Regions:
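Class I SAM-dependent methyltransferase Rossmann-like catalytic core
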Residues: 2-20
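Conserved alpha-helix/loop element of class I SAM-dependent methyltransferases that forms part
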Residues: 17-36
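A short SAM/SAH-binding and catalytic strip from SAM-dependent methyltransferases
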Residues: 105-118
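A short glycine-rich, Lys/Arg-flanked "PGG" loop and its adjoining helix->strand segment in the class I
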Residues: 120-134
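Class I SAM-dependent methyltransferase SAM/SAH-binding core
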Residues: 39, 45-47, 51-95
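Core SAM-dependent methyltransferase catalytic element
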Residues: 177-192
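A short acidic, Gly/Pro-enriched loop at the edge of an enzyme's catalytic core
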Residues: 97-106
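Conserved class I S-adenosyl-L-methionine
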Residues: 136-160
Length: 192
């Protein structure tokens, strides 16, 4: 059984890209360099995959349940000469990521914590991260109307996400101000 999340359909790529200044967001969430591998839960069009791959010394493992999204990311990896991108079709909600425990320096969970089992997803991210590894989370804000995103009723608040992140074992949870680059989103960072 597929675990495609509720209200997870993607809009047109150009419209989707209009919601984010991805380079600025990735600078704030990832930094200018990641030493090691990055895992991306739900890569979509690769909006965040490409800038992340440019900043990491290791691989970016970009996972999505939708084959057409993975194909899009693979094509971008070729177009932008990013051989460190490994895009795979994977139902990580139902089956986990399939990567070794402690093998990742950074885990990205962007626009996914409205799914039915957010703590399970966060625990899988925790499992993949090396000691001291970083989790970055962004999600659609629930306190304002937005032009896209899941219904307001199922969007988690930053406070809910912080509690879930802590329940999954993370510490040093901090807010990241994304208003200049992703005005419809909030950001959080945490450490394993």
């Amino acid at each position: 059984m597929s675990m495609k999340g509720r209200e997870s359909g993607m809009p047109d790529e150009a419209y989707w890209a209009s919601f984010f200044e991805t380079e600025i967001a990735i600078d704030k969430l990832i930094g200018t360099a990641v030493l090691g591998n990055v895992i991306e839960f739900g890569c979509g069009y690769g909006s965040f995959t490409v800038p992340t791959a440019r900043r990491t010394t290791g691989r970016v493992i970009a996972l999505d349940i939708e084959p057409e999204m993975v194909d899009c990311v693979r094509q971008k990896a070729v177009t932008f000469d990013l051989p460190n991108v490994q895009a795979d079709v994977r139902d990580f909600v139902a089956h986990g990521t399939g990567v070794d425990s402690g093998s990742q320096a950074h885990a990205m969970i962007f626009n996914l914590l409205h799914l039915e089992q957010p703590i399970s997803l966060l625990r899988e991210a925790y499992r993949t991260l090396q000691e001291g590894g970083v989790l970055s989370v962004i999600h659609w804000r629930s306190d304002i109307p937005t032009p896209r995103g899941p219904s307001l009723e199922i969007r988690p608040t930053p406070e809910q996400c912080r509690a879930w992140i802590a329940d999954a074992g993370f510490h040093s949870i901090a807010s990241v101000d994304l208003q200049d680059c992703c005005p419809f989103h909030f950001g959080l960072l945490a450490r394993r």
